[in-house]
């Protein structure tokens, strides 16, 4: 314990958090944030974008994220403190790089709740089309906003229950799906085409689909924020990141492969946003469709969205408290002791964003991925600059070659993002750069605290 305390103090912070999390706790935390059934919500978009090679898109996405996970593991060993890519960029490169990386991740924080609401609302609208999509959106946003203001939080035990239920639903779908394939339902037969189809393969198209598929992997990096609470030593966080990524990657590939075999004609989806539920109905009937829809609504629209909304509201509260945003956002509810103004602002932003992207899940996912992928580029550069540039490391494989490969892969995926996501992303980046200049001119702190 003393050794761990010393390591943290070397970074300039006092060890104040209890080190109680095991490797398994860290891994479950990563699985909860990545959501093992994440492809349920974006399957149709990825399938159409990859010309039916949806399993390949997830495989490439997993490989890309593994190299990024290796860089996370390397930096978490060097800086075992609560934080993430923005902390590593700040310490590995400089304060300005850390600010920009944090600003880019902030884009994710703002847009992720909206995506979760859109996916969940689309799922429920598919089974109750009489209720307009906007009604479902308002309902999800209202429920989560009230819960977050009152202050009810999901505990670690609740997270474990949710992950178990998700895995049960996933197992049911895979088993029923495999039986449907064996029976030749909908003309299904076993083939490797979801992994590679020479007649349809186009690297550009597949990488475009990967740029959306990687959304399902976002969340593994959240494990890094628990570095100060891990009792497994420096390597525990890095190992948990890599293992959870591999586990969820395999689950993504299996479920999308089965789905692609049941409905091989990816061009005939009535609505790509709800394609997975139609496939579930073909495989097992209406009950399986309902089961996958409810699982998506609970996992995306309640569990994940509640945490995501709470996270961004506390970031806004923290920045307002540090005088980087209007002071009103730092107001705390007198009874519930929660940042209620920030929480309501997040709800308003989510409502505006969801209204604009209501039937454009793929585009919304790409906007989110712009922030994440660009921040990951900073991460890989941080490893090289810190270890090779500052520490003069001779371990070129770990500190130069691997992060360089990761940089190239992520850059290629980033290049294949759609035009809208790049336009919105660069506008956000430009605002961040101007804001950084203003902070420097007024000699104010440029750190963005995302750990509140």
Task: Show the residue positions of the predicted features.
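Helix-loop-helix junctions that connect adjacent transmembrane segments
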Residues: 17, 54-55, 129-132, 161-291
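TM-loop-TM module centered on a large, flexible mid-protein loop between adjacent transmembrane helices
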Residues: 87, 94, 126, 240-306, ...
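Helix-loop-helix connectors at the membrane interface of multi-pass transporters/channels
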Residues: 1-2, 7-10, 86-91, 96, ...
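Transmembrane alpha-helical segments of multi-pass small-molecule transport proteins
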Residues: 58-60, 127-154, 170-173, 342-349, ...
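Extracellular loop-to-transmembrane helix junctions
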Residues: 39-136, 140, 244-247, 253-254, ...
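Membrane-interface "cap" regions at the ends of multi-pass membrane proteins
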Residues: 1-44, 48-53, 59, 65-70, ...
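A generic transmembrane alpha-helix motif of multi-pass inner-membrane proteins
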Residues: 360, 368, 372, 397-452
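Membrane-helix boundary/coupling elements in multi-pass transport proteins
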Residues: 81, 104-117, 217, 221-230, ...
């Amino acid at each position: 314990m003393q050794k761990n305390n010393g390591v943290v103090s070397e970074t300039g912070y006092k060890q104040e958090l209890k080190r109680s999390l095991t490797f398994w706790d860290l891994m479950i935390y990563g699985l909860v944030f990545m959501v093992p059934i994440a492809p349920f919500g974006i399957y149709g978009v990825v399938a159409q974008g990859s010309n039916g090679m949806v399993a390949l898109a997830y495989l490439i996405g997993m490989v890309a994220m593994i190299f990024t996970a290796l860089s996370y593991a390397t930096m978490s060993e060097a800086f075992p403190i609560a934080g993430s890519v923005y902390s590593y960029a700040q310490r590995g490169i400089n304060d300005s790089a850390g600010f920009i990386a944090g600003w880019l991740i902030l884009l994710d924080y703002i847009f992720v709740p909206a995506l979760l609401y859109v996916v969940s609302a689309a799922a429920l609208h598919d089974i109750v089309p009489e209720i307009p999509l906007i009604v479902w959106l308002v309902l999800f946003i209202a429920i989560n906003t009230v819960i977050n203001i009152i202050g009810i939080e999901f505990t670690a035990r609740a997270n474990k229950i949710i992950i178990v239920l998700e895995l049960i639903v996933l197992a049911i779908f895979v088993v029923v799906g495999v039986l449907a394939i064996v029976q030749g339902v909908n003309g299904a037969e076993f083939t490797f085409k979801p992994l590679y189809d020479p007649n349809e393969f186009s690297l550009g198209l597949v990488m475009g689909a990967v740029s959306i598929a990687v959304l399902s992997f976002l969340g593994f990096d959240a494990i890094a924020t628990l570095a100060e609470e891990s009792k497994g030593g420096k390597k525990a966080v890095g190992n948990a990141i890599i293992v959870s990524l591999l586990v969820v990657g395999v689950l993504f590939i299996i479920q999308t492969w089965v789905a692609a075999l049941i409905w091989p004609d990816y061009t005939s989806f009535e609505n790509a946003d709800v394609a997975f539920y139609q496939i579930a109905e073909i495989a097992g009937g209406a009950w399986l469709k309902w089961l996958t829809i409810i699982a998506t609504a609970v996992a995306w629209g309640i569990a994940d969205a509640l945490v995501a909304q709470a996270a961004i509201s506390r970031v806004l509260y923290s920045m307002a408290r540090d005088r980087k945003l209007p002071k009103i956002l730092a107001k705390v509810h007198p009874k519930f002791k929660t940042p209620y103004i920030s929480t309501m602002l997040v709800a308003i932003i989510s409502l505006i964003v969801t209204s604009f992207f209501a039937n454009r899940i793929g585009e919304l996912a790409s906007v989110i991925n712009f922030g994440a992928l660009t921040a990951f580029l900073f991460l890989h550069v941080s490893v090289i600059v810190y270890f090779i540039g500052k520490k003069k490391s001779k371990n070129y494989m770990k500190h130069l070659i691997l992060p360089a490969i990761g940089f190239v892969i992520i850059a290629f995926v980033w290049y294949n993002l759609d035009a809208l996501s790049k336009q919105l992303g660069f506008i956000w980046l430009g605002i961040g750069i101007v804001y950084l200049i203003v902070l420097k001119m007024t000699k104010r702190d440029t750190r963005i605290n995302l750990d509140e």
